[in-house]
Amino acid sequence: MRIVLVGPPGAGKGTQATRLAETLHIPHISTGDLFRANISQQTELGKLAKSYMDAGNLVPDEVTIAMDRTAWSSPTPRAFLLDGFPRNVSQAEALDELLETEDMKLDAVLDLEAPEDEVVKRIAGRRVCRNDSAHVFHVTYTPPKKEGVCDVCGGELYQRDDDSEETVRKRLEVYHTQTEPIIDYYKSQGLVATIAATGP
């Protein structure tokens, strides 16, 4: 099964992708995780991506595609769940071309929908462990036992630069103008299923 997961920032794509990948026993390829790993390792691609992410802008196609290609094993996996890619029609077309060279097609595009105010609340309240970015808390929904301290490893919790309310609103604006059009692109292929992503 080959699935693309789309939705605004804060809709729960990462959480749902992890659950789906485990249930379906397919690899989960997260562009956001690739970006953060490259930023943490201070690679040239990571530094470039960070400058765009901190401003709330989409990372340019050539940078995104370069990072995503590093995540694909050789040969291309026959089944996968993509989270965070494609983010615009140009990337969707590039993905279709790549899959076509491997004699594959997407099976489904899952569109997670969430109200904008809920998205802002979710993201602005998120806190991440400096020691392990997989340890994520929320000041309202899943607060740590001790403020600012990771329950799992005792590491410091912090708010990512791209999680401030101002940056979140900018990211939503970018999502509406650049990413939402891929939903129509995939609807024309009969691939889209819309899922309400409400609640914490």
From Swiss-Prot:
It is found in: Cytoplasm. Pathway: Purine metabolism; AMP biosynthesis via salvage pathway; AMP from ADP: step 1/1. ATP binds at G10, A11, G12, K13, G14, T15, R126, V136, F137. Monomer. Pfam families: ADK, ADK_lid. It comes from Streptomyces lividans. Consists of three domains, a large central CORE domain and two small peripheral domains, NMPbind and LID, which undergo movements during catalysis. The LID domain closes over the site of phosphoryl transfer upon ATP binding. Assembling and dissambling the active center during each catalytic cycle provides an effective means to prevent ATP hydrolysis. Belongs to the adenylate kinase family. Residues 125-163 are annotated as: LID. This is Adenylate kinase. AMP binds at T31, R36, N57, L58, V59, G84, F85, P86, R87, Q91, R160, R171. InterPro entries: Adenyl_kin_sub, Adenylat/UMP-CMP_kin, Adenylat_kinase_CS, Adenylate_kinase_lid-dom, P-loop_NTPase. Residues 30-59 are annotated as: NMP. GO terms for biological process: AMP salvage. GO terms for cellular component: cytoplasm.
